[in-house]
Amino acid sequence: MLASFSEGIVPTLFSRIIRGEIPGRFVWSDERCVALLTIAPLRPGHALVVSREEVDEWTDADDDLVAHLMVVAKQIGAAQKSAFDAPRAGILIAGFEVPHLHLHVFPSWGIDDFDFSNADHDPEPAELDAAADALRAALRKAGHGDLVPSS
């Protein structure tokens, strides 16, 4: 029988990406979290702010971690608005597909951008690369260069 998530024996998909076992397009990395582009974006530049700690639901995380993730999400959102000329940055916490605390942060032009049925499930890799590069550049311009990985 497989170990449960809470026992920490079987790593989540996000833990495997963070460890480098699975590739990811990282745009932020610090001691508590990473941010990377999703492979099914609602809009170009859609990022996931992912806790390094394996916590399933955000309501189970400690307050300091939740606060840190929100601060990082705010920086990512501001960079998305700049990089993609978006009027707003949206944020969602769902957690149904991967049982590992993560926030969806994406440039938004309207309420339809919050509908996961509108996600692009087959984006061109070159488009994802370009979006990651644009977001990294905006984060560096905002003064976060020390937290922005090269890829």
Labelled PLM ranges:
Residues M1-S151:
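HIT superfamily nucleotide-processing domains
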